[in-house]
Swiss-Prot record:
Cellular component aspect of the GO annotation: large ribosomal subunit
GO MF term list: rRNA binding; structural constituent of ribosome; transferase activity
Protein name: Large ribosomal subunit protein uL2
Pfam families found in the cross-reference section: Ribosomal_L2 (PF00181), Ribosomal_L2_C (PF03947)
Record note on quaternary structure: Part of the 50S ribosomal subunit. Forms a bridge to the 30S subunit in the 70S ribosome.
InterPro entries associated with the record: NA-bd_OB-fold, Rib_uL2_dom2, Ribosomal_uL2, Ribosomal_uL2_bac/org-type, Ribosomal_uL2_C, Ribosomal_uL2_CS, Ribosomal_uL2_dom3, Ribosomal_uL2_RNA-bd_dom
Alphabetical keyword list: Ribonucleoprotein, Ribosomal protein, RNA-binding, rRNA-binding
Organism: Streptococcus pyogenes serotype M1
Keyword rRNA-binding annotated: yes
Similarity-based family: Belongs to the universal ribosomal protein uL2 family.
Biased composition (Basic and acidic residues): 264-277
Biological role stated in the UniProt entry: One of the primary rRNA binding proteins. Required for association of the 30S and 50S subunits to form the 70S ribosome, for tRNA binding and peptide bond formation. It has been suggested to have peptidyltransferase activity; this is somewhat controversial. Makes several contacts with the 16S rRNA in the 70S ribosome.
HAMAP family, per database record: Ribosomal_uL2_B
Amino acid sequence: MGIKVYKPTTNGRRNMTSLDFAEITTSTPEKSLLVSLKSKAGRNNNGRITVRHQGGGHKRHYRLIDFKRNKDGVEAVVKTIEYDPNRTANIALVHYTDGVKAYIIAPKGLEVGQRIVSGPDADIKVGNALPLANIPVGTVVHNIELKPGKGGELVRAAGASAQVLGQEGKYVLVRLQSGEVRMILGTCRATIGTVGNEQQSLVNIGKAGRSRWKGIRPTVRGSVMNPNDHPHGGGEGKAPVGRKAPSTPWGKPALGLKTRNKKAKSDKLIVRRRNEK
């Protein structure tokens, strides 16, 4: 999918880019796989803001995605490649030979009319899903499960990929895009290939209104707030932070504070941390 560059007909259009959607084959989603999606605007069940800078934006329907890929031995034909407003990756509508329809994350190179299949005996071909133990070393994968049967949780964003490095007993070593090397159970499934729409990260939003269409609200600097709104607020003119280190709006240290649980059980499964050389 290429990048479309706009002419500077207005200030908002200057430097603006977008995807050309050349891979998208239809703009009409499969109705049976749509669910209504209520805008939460960053609020929890108590009505309190738990995620800032969210709200507004275009109304969306949620597309039910098959992250489990557990219909073993049943072939499916790719019918369409579609845009999904709820994620950076594109999605593909597949029709199984038993009549079931499903959406999957569209990997790079997947084409309409292509046949895909899941199961331990599936070929090592883009779009096929297999247990990690059955995938050869060096293969690039995405949509990786962390618990067998739960569905893919890792490597689902546009352009993301991971690589199978080897096998140790019942675990398989996988190198994630961050550089982290992690042990994952060999019975967990993964899909062959890289997630498509890899140029999505190169898009220049161009103007504030386009972020608002996506449901992203403005981010205000703490230094321009009042003291009752942020630890950096107050003072005369452009005042410094006034603290030993920058703080979050709730007074916790910002920039560099480690937030990972030191007793995380998954520590024993991480062979190399992402920030290790």
